[in-house]
Regions:
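Acidic two-metal-ion nuclease catalytic site recognized across multiple nuclease folds
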Residues: 6, 16-20, 170-181
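Conserved beta-strand -> loop -> alpha-helix junction used to position metal-binding or nucleic-acid-contacting
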Residues: 121-133
Length: 181
């Protein structure tokens, strides 16, 4: 049985304007995977995929899927968790197809999606880390959390913080909007 994404009415703080003359009309889907990591030679499996959909310069929808894989945190094993990323492809993939995908340091997200569906064309892609480096060369750090702190883009989502797929996807969306102004 297909499980819908957990949709959230996350209290996402308004994104400050960096440049009032900027074009904020670009629509995109910011995504973030959380993975089990490589531990003692085991596979690095995604256990959470968070997303934030942006339309006309505002986060209009957020959600997440959990994947029930070995080595994942307890919440990935809840009753509404999906199987593996590959076995639940038809549930989550339509949300990501045919849209501009935004991620921070896209190598991880792009690799996971390509591994799950090698013949699927994902993207076009936008990397917020590359955008930040281009707009603000010489910063002491280009980590997502550090950039969001520097630019006042840290989301406010009850019970969530960094290294949570939903939280990081919303943070990435906020940062993309800020950098795109």
């Amino acid at each position: 049985m297909a499980c819908p994404a957990r949709i959230h009415g996350a209290a996402v703080r308004d994104v400050p304007q960096r440049n009032e003359g900027g074009d904020r009309a670009v629509n995109f889907l910011a995504i973030d995977f959380e993975t089990t990591g490589y531990d003692f030679g085991s596979a690095n499996e995604p256990w959470q995929l968070g997303y934030a959909r942006v339309e006309a310069g505002a986060v209009v929808e957020t959600g997440e899927w959990f994947f029930d894989v070995e080595g994942a945190p307890e919440r990935a094993h809840e009753a509404d968790a999906l199987g593996t990323l590959q076995s639940s492809f038809e549930t989550w993939a339509p949300k990501l197809m045919g849209v501009r995908l935004v991620a921070h340091n896209i190598a991880c997200e792009r690799t996971i999606l390509t591994r799950a569906a090698p013949l699927t064309k994902w993207g076009p892609w936008v990397d917020t880390m590359k955008l930040a480096k281009a707009r603000y060369p010489g910063l002491p750090s280009y980590k997502l959390g550090d950039l969001c702190e520097m630019f006042g883009q840290v989301p406010v989502i009850d019970g969530r913080t960094w290294h949570d797929g939903l939280f990081d996807a919303v943070a990435c969306a906020n940062l993309a909007l800020f950098l795109g102004d």
